[in-house]
Amino acid sequence: MVHHKVTIIGSGPAAHTAAIYLARAEIKPTLYEGMFANGVAAGGQLTTTTEIENFPGFPDGLTGSDLMERMKAQSVKFGTEVVTETVAKVDLSARPFKLWTEFNEDEEPTTTDAIILATGASAKRLGLPGEETYWQRGISACAVCDGAVPIFRNKPLAVVGGGDSACEEASFLTKYGSKVFMLVRKDHMRASTIMQRRVERNEKIEVLYNTAPVEAKGDGSLLDALRVRDTRTGEESDLPVNGLFYAIGHTPATQLVAGQVDLDESGYVKTVPGSTLTNVPGLFAAGDVQDSRYRQAVTSAGSGCMAALDAEKFLSELE
């Protein structure tokens, strides 16, 4: 039976930062990066980002794929074992924990003293016609990550959603766009009163109620319009915009541990405040799988560091 001291499940900034810290501490972690785990290539959601300008140390920016390749190279350099298999099942009922990879669920499990869960969260999409064509070519799920890139500057933009997050993203985008349309499917927002007032006072934001996007349009290279539908009359028209931002929530990749660890009402792993500890001793959660608020590459990396230090302390207390 194969046994690991620490197993990291994930392939984004949190996973590889945890691996770097553990490997440098000579703990020799094993990282399961997955084979299109949760529908995303190894490297996580960042691999779908064409340009990152807000990760410290890269004044000229770099692509999400480049950043993750560098992180992986660094974790491997210090001794991380990277396994390109997807963990399909875990048993957290007793230590050592047990895990099985995809297509090997009936085989003997691998055991591990500790697990760092860094499986991330995926942005909810609408599945519009044209969405795949213009994803990261005008369509994004993160205004803070992408709002400042050149294709959005001084251009009309749109935000889908009617909650606090949508209001926050619309307000943020007014720093860069010439105008921001909020597309709200119903005749009212569900955002808090204070956020609605903030939107109403911003001259660069126009709220389009009873409006739903039905198609992303462009020249095949960049988005330049949305086909929108009036949800009351069914009438459709084109809205000229160069950016579409989804603010309709994220889905944390917690199905692997559902029923075995405490999750919040949105499905994110609950951690002890100020740490990555969960209610299961030996299981640590890092990155977007436990962060419903910030969801940034740099905050994910920071929590990966925390998880490594928490895991190292846990292991030392076992000895």
Swiss-Prot record:
Homodimer. Its EC number is 1.8.1.9. Binds 1 FAD per subunit. FAD binds at S11, G12, P13, A14, V40, A41, Q45, N54, V87, C145, D288, R295, Q296, A297. The active site is a redox-active disulfide bond. One of its GO terms (cellular component) is cytosol. Gene3D superfamilies: FAD/NAD(P)-binding domain. Disulfide bonds join C142-C145. The lineage of its organism: Eukaryota, Fungi, Dikarya, Ascomycota, Saccharomycotina. Belongs to the class-II pyridine nucleotide-disulfide oxidoreductase family. Keywords: Cytoplasm, Disulfide bond, FAD, Flavoprotein, NADP, Oxidoreductase, Redox-active center. This is Thioredoxin reductase.
